[in-house]
Amino acid sequence: MAGSSGQQGKGRRVQPQWSPPAGTQPCRLHLYNSLTRNKEVFIPQDGKKVTWYCCGPTVYDASHMGHARSYISFDILRRVLKDYFKFDVFYCMNITDIDDKIIKRARQNHLFEQYLEKRPEAAQLLEDVQAALKPFSVKLNETTDPDKKQMLERIQHEVQLATEPLEKAVQSRLTGEEVNSCVEVLLEEAKDLLSDWLDSTLGSDVTDNSIFSKLPKFWEGEFHRDMEALNVLPPDVLTRVSEYVPEIVNFVQKIVDNGYGYVSDGSVYFDTAKFASSEKHSYGKLVPEAVGDQKALQEGEGDLSISADRLSEKRSPNDFALWKASKPGEPSWPCPWGKGRPGWHIECSAMAGTLLGASMDIHGGGFDLRFPHHDNELAQSEAYFENDCWVRYFLHTGHLTITGCKMSKSLKNFITIKDALKKHSARQLRLAFLMHSWKDTLDYSSNTMESALQYEKFLNEFFLNVKDILRAPVDITGQFEKWGEEEAELNKNFYDKKTAIHEALCDNVDTRTVMEEMRALVSQCNLYMAARKAMRKRPNRALLENIALYLTHMLKIFGAIEEESSLGFPVGGSGTSLNLESTVMPYLQVLSEFREGVRKIAREQKVPEVLQLSDALRDDILPELGVRFEDPEGLPTVVKLVDRNTLLKEREEKRQVEEEKRKKKEEAARRKQEQEAAKLAKMKIPPSEMFLSETDKYSKFDENGLPTHDAEGKELSKGQAKKVKKLFEAQEKLYKEYLQMPQNGSFQ
């Protein structure tokens, strides 16, 4: 034994060598970078922290679907980076509340309000409109842009139409209500025309800075309400140009000190030639082919900054304003160069530079901002920081068209966010955006929205069906069921789809592919549930719940499902917060079972009135409460909580279909009745009389009433005689049937 023991000690067993699996290279996030026009691996500068600046709106009018295109798309990208890829995103957005458009619109609104307060007489109004039409006509003739020309022509036409009734009323010396009504119509139609004219003549007299702050403050509030309604997350920090004027002045001064800016007549301009000639810098990084495009550059400078005297202040036409000397009728702030206001491009540079420093990870904006706005932002910021990497990744969202056309007020396809939300929910709009690439053109049309509505309905039905399965009572161990081949196959498909979705998100956040993969996964689940139902077997609860939870999680990440956030611990401990479904469903289940019992008795006892009441509960009462009862043949009632408006819409569509069927049935019955009446009327005619009234065809008849001569007195040919004989015999048969009808009771 001792020897044996020693043997064991000598040959002691040890664990075999272990080798890690080869594995696969993890998929990395790539983003389409406008600086390279390629998809690049996304590598933040500081670990998982991501600094992100997004160009916000210029707030002088209602937000429209073009704004929604950018802000919903960036909201989706931000959520995916934060909640899916788990980056620590610091998101900054600006509000442009000092701008040429704002100044002009504020002055126009103020002057038009003053004009209305004076209550101009009809004759004076007509005189003013004619005066305003003169410069307007010159502007119309000089306009070459077809969309803008169409808009101006429409304004001119509508003003002329509104002018005529008032001119006639004045000529006829009408007074009172009739004239006042014509005045109101003309004031409404000529508002833009008169506002522009008043601004050109009196705009320089507007000096109160509060007039220029009132307008953007109002529209900023409307913008935030629109974003909240669209479920767009608010930025981590919001910057307003009006609150950063001192920082902008300092930013401009340093650019001048670094040799890239120059002062001219109280304004400060960026020296593009000096910057481009520097070995450290490049001008026009985003759209180099657009450098020198004077039309684009002038649009970037603003309507109030492209007069001949302004343009003459520049060393080069390619230079752009960092600071503008204020003219009479423009707001102003003190600075080393005299009273003035910021240029458009410098505003973003100063605010983003103040908060995010010399280099940010992501800068975002709409596609049409690439040049000159973003190229000029890059230039002046890199001139300030003396670097070549102010932005690492530039993301630009695609255009939005309206039913294939460029969005334009002149084409009457300018849709505000509020108007869009009257037709479709925020979720439906977001689903439409998710079903398209964020960087490509999106066509906002009835077809696009119908696809989104169908997708929403498709997913919702799946979630409702899974909820119904999960509500089926089981004991605590019964919720874990043995898997068969069908469950194993569905689970494999589930993990395959998760991989495909991850790869799509890594590929420039390709939500379009993600949505298709999710649709395919739901289709596989539907086939599985249908097969189990056909076999009278219960689907696997845990598997379907896992898939439904995953899909819900993804939709929450995309912002398609809202989550209520709360601070701190829930009141009353965990699990006590109100959940409508878990609270209401037990009561609905009791109601459903009671209704089933009542229906069973009503069918057995043949009480149709009770069955009708039961159907009315299902079809008329419960939908008003957002509850759907489904009565599948031979199976228990399925209870679903659905959005009330969705159910009411479904009910209305069902009623319309039924009404259409009823109308078609009535129409068919009416046609049948008319045909029978016509047939009866024909049957009543004795064959001997059937041709006698046709004097336009025949002139002579035999003793039986058969025609022998045509209308011109010529004897009928053999063929014609044979034809009328055949008609005569057919009528003879019909008349015979008619005479027999009272005897056999066919007609009463």
Curated annotation (Swiss-Prot):
A motif ('KIIK' region) lies at residues 101-104. It holds the Pfam family tRNA-synt_1e. A motif ('KMSKS' region) lies at residues 406-410. Residues 1-25, 654-686, 700-721 are annotated as: Disordered. One of its GO terms (cellular component) is cytoplasm. The modification N-acetylalanine is found at residue 2. A motif ('HIGH' region) lies at residues 57-67. GO terms for biological process: cysteinyl-tRNA aminoacylation. It catalyses: tRNA(Cys) + L-cysteine + ATP = L-cysteinyl-tRNA(Cys) + AMP + diphosphate. Residues 654-679, 700-717 have a biased composition (Basic and acidic residues). The modification Phosphoserine is found at residues 19, 305, 307, 746. ATP binds at residue 409. It is found in: Cytoplasm. L-cysteine binds at residues 56, 96, 373. Its cofactor is Zn(2+). Binds 1 zinc ion per subunit. Keywords: Acetylation, Aminoacyl-tRNA synthetase, ATP-binding, Cytoplasm, Ligase, Metal-binding, Nucleotide-binding, Phosphoprotein, Protein biosynthesis, Zinc. Its EC number is 6.1.1.16. Its main location: cytoplasm. Zn(2+) binds at residues 55, 348, 373, 377. SUPFAM superfamilies: Anticodon-binding domain of a subclass of class I aminoacyl-tRNA synthetases, Nucleotidylyl transferase. It comes from the Eukaryota. Catalyzes the ATP-dependent ligation of cysteine to tRNA(Cys). Homodimer. This is Cysteine--tRNA ligase, cytoplasmic. It comes from Macaca fascicularis. The gene is CARS1.
